Swiss-Prot record:
This protein is a spindle body protein. The keyword Signal applies. It comes from the Viruses. Pfam families: LPMO_10. Gene3D superfamilies: chitin-binding protein cbp21. Residues 1-20 form the signal peptide. This is Spindolin. The lineage of its organism: Viruses, Varidnaviria, Bamfordvirae, Nucleocytoviricota, Pokkesviricetes. Keywords: Disulfide bond, Signal. Homodimer; disulfide-linked. InterPro entries: Cellulose/chitin-bd_N (IPR004302), GlcNAc_Chitin_IntDeg (IPR051024), Ig_E-set (IPR014756).
Amino acid sequence: MNKFYYICIYINILYVCVSGHGYMTFPIARQRRCSVRGGQWWPPNGDGITDTMCRAAYQNVYNKVLNQYNDPQEAATAAQYMFQQDNEYAALAGPDYTNLCNLQQNVVPNNLCAAGADDWDVVPFGDKSGMDLPGNWVPTVIPLDSNHQSSVALELEFCPTAVHDPSYYEVYITNSGFNVHTDNVVWGNLELIFNDTVPLRPKSSTSTCNANPNVYRFTVSIPVRPAQFVLYVRWQRIDPVGEGFYNCVDMAFDYAAGPSEEDVIYPDYEAPGQNAYTCHANRNKYGGNYENTIDEDKYQAQLDESIKSRYDKYSRHKGGKFGQKQCNGNKHHYNKYTKYYNQNYKNNKNY
């Protein structure tokens, strides 16, 4: 079976060429770390990969495709593609890309670290689902100045292999009960900590971005977690196609004297499966113990005014205003959103 690394998609009478576009370089994205460490080219079954989790990710896809096609070369091509396309962990949301429920339910409902790509037959994204395996992923370690710090202001760097503007960034963090060794990264265990436009800036002298002299650098206040955690970074283009890029970043904080034992959380619940999914962005509670993990009102209020104004010019067709789509039967009317936005945007911007 032949696979094309590039594809042109015809959407809304627009031809859009999709190719590689970038990755997190600091802290380094999971798929980028595997690509840089190498070892995927020989032998074909991935035994030459020295990093334990990168090898497990490779062999997960290799064995899946081998079982499907009974062709070792096809299986190797699929697994190598997951490493080779480290700058194209992408998904297309269409003009409704600001609708969080649409994103969670239809665009990247599972396999978040793979940007939802879990089928080798789907061109150009392929199967990158090995990156979603729980396990002992190597983190970027950030030292703490004090064991009593509640957050750390850290400058993040995204290396664009192709520049896309206008655009904006979102950064999520796994919650305090997340266990990287047993849990999948799912929307239900993510908390939004950053949402804003980011200008291109010259890269620093310590940058590992070799694809571009300019990078997206932005400072994020990261809540301190006592155990290893994951940042989930979304780089979203502002256009009718709604192309977005999704990276999992493995991180840990280095305590000066180690965290107190009582502060370390060991999850005692069963890790949710990839199919155990519900939307966590509805305005209303559904009864029982259901509670919104990511509040959509505050999520929408966080969208920068420049994002809103730029988006409006693209959203005049098909009623594509903010929050106008349905999520689990809730109709979000534009007028209601506008009223909320005007009254509460400034107060909620720093949520």
